[in-house]
Amino acid sequence: MTERLLIKALSGGKNTKIITLNGKKMTKMPSALGKLPGLKTLVLQNNLIPKVCPELCNLTQLTTLNLGNNLLEEVPEEMKYLTSLKNLHLSGNRICRFAPGACDGLQNLILLNLNNNHLTQLPQEVSRLKSLTYMSINYNQLASIPRELCFLENLVELQLNYNQLICIPEEIKFLKKLQKLLLARNNIGVLPEELCDLKKLRILDIAGNIIQIFPSGFQDLKLREFYCEGNPLFLQQPVISTQQENVWSLQEITSRFVMNQLAENNPFLMDDIERYPQVRSMISQGKTCAICGQYFITVWLECVRFVPPPKDWKISKNLKLVPLQVLICSYKCFTQRDPNLFGIAQV
């Protein structure tokens, strides 16, 4: 049956645009495919193919390639020759790596599906997928998101459910077009404040992680759907506690002075600071007190404010209050807080 279909396709020559050989128990990719340079769509899913044939390199007009549910162990190097490729489906394989150079020629790729594989990391070369709009890598073993992925400026949807992620890079803020972010069932403990810079984000799923509190600007996101069930969120259960005022280090006192002077555009400091990269690095970690608005480095006491989720959010069941992180610089500011702001106690 497979042979007849190939013979028929070959007889069409340059006019053959689509080949579908789904579920044919094929153990190798037919090398004869290389004689169809005008091929646009190639579907070889649900077979037993362990690697692609070298002749795949000839299919430079191919726009859709489906090799899902085969036995591939890597994203092959031959992919770099498919310069017209827009849709690449590689789900349900045994992929644990990208071959060197695999991403080099995929500047037109729009959709990449790597669900249900064995990836533990992504290469820095993913940054070369400049047109990528939809990326799905659910059910893998990723421990981190490379910062390079965050420079895919056309990315609209990113799915990383059921991995082993423990954090999200601050560079997430550069995904300005991102509308859908799925991170369910990972090991994420903290969401970066930079997540709140994603003005186009509409769907966020962080269910089944270990998140206790959300960044202070979280409520400003224009979400339509938000799912967070299965996280150990802080609850509004006040207890009586005491907190002593700290004695600041000289570094903290100096940093606060410098940052607050820079905020006032002190011309002498602005010129001098350029000559001291270590100082610039240190004050780049500065935070703003939610009470007095002054800058500081060391968090004196982490606080939380409980707010109801916006009414237009479609949310997880039973989510009544969202715990938002609030940072305060001193005991003095803590005593001036509003009654809906609580210090986080270790009990």
Curated annotation (Swiss-Prot):
LRR repeats: 38-60, 61-82, 84-105, 108-129, 131-153, 154-175, 177-199, 200-222
UniProt keyword annotations, A-Z: Leucine-rich repeat, Repeat
One biological process term in Gene Ontology: intracellular signal transduction
Family named by the database record: Belongs to the LRRC69 family.
Name of the protein in its database record: Leucine-rich repeat-containing protein 69
